[in-house]
UniProtKB/Swiss-Prot annotation:
Required cofactor names: Mn(2+)
Keywords: Carbohydrate metabolism, Hydrolase, Manganese
Assigned protein family: Belongs to the FBPase class 3 family.
The UniProt record lists the keyword Nucleotide-binding: no
Biological process according to GO: gluconeogenesis
Highest taxon of source: Bacteria
Keyword Manganese among record annotations: yes
Entry GO MF terms: fructose 1,6-bisphosphate 1-phosphatase activity
EC number(s) from the headed UniProt entry: 3.1.3.11
Pfam families to which the protein is assigned, alphabetical: FBPase_2
Reactions catalysed: beta-D-fructose 1,6-bisphosphate + H2O = beta-D-fructose 6-phosphate + phosphate
Gene3D superfamilies to which the protein is assigned, alphabetical: 3.60.21.10
Protein name per its UniProtKB record: Fructose-1,6-bisphosphatase class 3
Length: 654
């Protein structure tokens, strides 16, 4: 069989393309359209990170576009509406269903309510006109409420210059009200505005962790119009569990037990924890203080005595299973350099002490009833059976399968995008800022090359989830806890010490030098270059570590080359940071960093109009307004134009 030449392939490709563009007029129209789009201002990118399962806080930031909605309202109405009216209009756009109920309760006559409907619909139409001013009509149409697209387009493109259609427009709105469609229209318009103020969302890691509703965040992202994800350490932990790593699964369950979030497993994903509870009831007591679950801020009533006791037992059972499961990985992978984490082998079970990193510590709150001192890494038959059942349930959960599939489809370890590098954790470096090497399959890898190899193994483990002890599956676990992991970014994970050793000095997890060298402009420039980006214009946009503004830490580092935007959604960190974190907006005029205050509830926003935002800081302003031509999407369009012009020349101009 003869091979097809490159020239023949080109001809076949052009043949296929000419079926779609079967006349020079059609082809010219498409080229004109694409060339024109290149001249539009670039859309607004919205960067969020470290959501940690905090669905309500994330929803608020998403709905207000990190203050972008209010900014547009202020632009239009600062001189004509009072602050209270602006607050009410903003709350309506954020939470249209709830705000409508409150508004309607305030009117004592239908006539007054109808006047409000007319005014509000007009304001929302004006807002859509303003928010969509840099989009094509085609793109705008996709953002409009489907059921009302025709009506909304008529109102958007109305022209009263000659006064010929005044009564036509009035009748349109009046009939909407008379037919009781105004609530649905207002709701649809509000969601259109939310969509129009943000063109693309970047989630820079950690959708999962200690928060109660990561599943709802995943459902939101699946339905979002344009999104990408850079995996965080907790996201990879969930991917690893689904991909067959029992060590990842045990870690994940332990964290859920610790933060009283086992309902994510049982209720959200439909996984039966009864076998684990039965095992825990048999071997552990419910009073061990080190394993009592943390109190949840969103559960003011708290747990019953029985619930607390059961979770405490589960917490101990899964922690001991985790320590056992990690041992064979460490032993079969010497290049991981993790022998220090063979903790159960370092315990003296007679004296109840451990010798670790050259120092001996007494142990407290121990729960070693299932550990064989002669073979500490050996699982009991019932422990093995429980983990097999849990892994099977995990991999058979339809909802979890959908969520993990989306994480793999939209997610990567890092993303170069519009000249910037988006990464959740770090690029491992030594004390001199030189990129650290890590050996995988006999070869040394560092920087971008290391991250590419890590990602290949994550994808392989996911594709072959029935294999649970191969290198790829072990490397997913290593990404969670290893010292050369770009996601962990520390020298060791001291989980055992935190449970069982009083001396807090043993709890310390020294960070990779990256975190104290990221003020170094030269190091950041070198990294940008390694990832194929322009070091003069590019930036690293980083999540993972909360910015301690309370201590004067600045999220803008290395002369603006490094931006740290841990969203601070996790309520546990807000006492140490002083704020609820940062998000970032990047539009055609430049970048703005937005600091967020603690988010109380949507009820407070609805009643008080509070936006929970503080100052925006301009990171930079573009000397020339950025166009679509200057973006990743622009490069794709330019390549399409090149091919279409080739077709025009080849088929119609000869």
């Amino acid at each position: 069989m003869t091979q097809t030449t490159e020239s023949e392939l080109r001809e076949k490709y052009l043949d296929l393309l000419s079926q779609q563009f079967d006349s020079p007029e059609k082809l010219a129209t498409e080229i004109v359209n694409l060339e024109s789009i290149l001249e539009l201002p670039k859309g607004t990118e919205h960067f969020v990170s470290d959501l940690h399962g905090e669905y309500e806080s994330f929803q608020h930031v998403l709905r207000n576009g990190s203050g972008n909605v209010r900014s547009k309202i202020n632009d239009l109405y600062a001189k004509t509406l009072s602050q209270k009216e602006i607050d009410d209009l903003a709350a309506l756009v954020y939470y249209p269903e709830e705000k409508l109920k409150l508004v309607k309760n305030n009117f004592d006559s239908k006539g007054k309510l109808n006047v409000w409907y007319i005014t509000t619909i007009e304001q929302l139409i004006d807002l859509i006109t303003y928010c969509s001013s840099k989009y094509t009509r085609s793109k705008l149409r996709k953002a409009l409420p489907k059921e009302y697209t025709y009506i909304v387009e008529e109102l958007l493109y109305k022209n009263n210059e000659f006064n010929n259609k005044k009564s036509y427009y009035e009748t349109l709105v009046n009939q909407i009200i008379e037919l009781e469609q105004s609530d649905d229209l207002i709701i649809g318009l509000s969601y259109s505005i939310q969509r129009l103020v943000v063109d693309h969302l970047h989630v820079v890691g950690d959708i999962y962790d200690r928060g109660p509703q990561p599943d709802k965040i995943m459902d939101t992202l699946i339905n979002y119009h344009s999104v990408d994800i850079q995996w965080g350490n907790h996201d990879v932990l969930w991917i690893g569990a689904y991909a067959g790593s029992k060590a990842c699964l045990a870690n994940l369950l332990r964290i859920c037990a610790r933060y009283d979030n086992l309902d994510i497993i049982e209720d959200a994903y439909g996984i039966n924890l009864r076998p684990l509870l039965t095992l825990a009831e048999e071997h552990y007591n419910g009073e061990n203080p080190a394993f009592k679950p943390k109190k949840r801020p969103d559960k003011p009533v708290g747990l019953s005595k029985l619930e607390e006791s059961q979770i405490t037992k589960i917490h101990q059972a899964i922690a001991m299973i985790q320590f056992k499961l990690e041992m064979p990985i460490i032993k079969r992978r010497p290049t991981f350099e993790m022998e220090d984490r063979l903790v159960l082998e370092k315990v003296n079970y007679d004296t109840n002490e451990i010798t670790i990193y050259g120092k001996t510590y007494p142990l407290k709150d121990t729960c070693f009833s299932t550990v064989d001192p002669q073979d500490p890494g050996k699982l009991l038959p019932e422990e093995e059976e429980v983990m097999n059942k849990l892994l099977l349930s995990f991999q058979q959960s339809e909802k979890l399968k959908r969520h993990m599939s989306f994480l793999m489809k939209k997610g990567k370890l890092y993303l170069p995008y519009n000249g910037n590098l988006l990464i959740h954790g770090c690029i491992p470096v030594d004390e001199n800022g030189e990129m650290e090497s890590f050996e995988i399959e006999g070869e040394q890898h560092k920087g971008r090359d290391l991250l590419d190899v890590f990602e290949r193994h994550v994808r392989y483990a996911y594709d072959y989830k029935e294999i649970t002890d191969d290198l790829s599956t072990d490397l997913v676990w290593y990404l969670w806890t290893g010292k050369y992991s770009s996601l962990f970014g520390k020298r060791a994970m001291t989980t055992f010490e935190r449970y069982f050793i009083e001396d807090k000095a043993s709890h310390k997890e020294p960070k990779n030098p990256y975190y104290y060298l990221r003020e170094d402009v030269d190091m950041i420039r070198k990294m940008l270059k390694d990832f194929g980006l322009n070091p003069d214009e590019g930036r690293i946009i980083n999540g993972h570590t909360p910015v301690k503004e309370i201590d004067g830490e600045d999220p803008i580092k290395a002369d603006g080359k490094m931006l740290v935007i841990d969203g601070g959604f996790s309520k546990a960190y807000q006492k140490t940071t002083g704020i609820a974190g940062y998000t970032l907006l990047y539009n055609s005029f430049g970048m703005q960093l937005v600091a967020h205050q603690h988010f109380d509830s949507r009820d407070k926003v609805l009643s008080d109009g509070a936006d929970e935002l503080s100052v925006r800081r301009v990171v930079d302003e573009e000397l020339q307004r950025k166009k679509i031509r200057d973006t990743n999407d622009g490069k794709v369009l330019q390549e399409q134009i090149r091919i279409l012009k080739l077709l025009m020349h080849d088929r119609y101009l000869n």
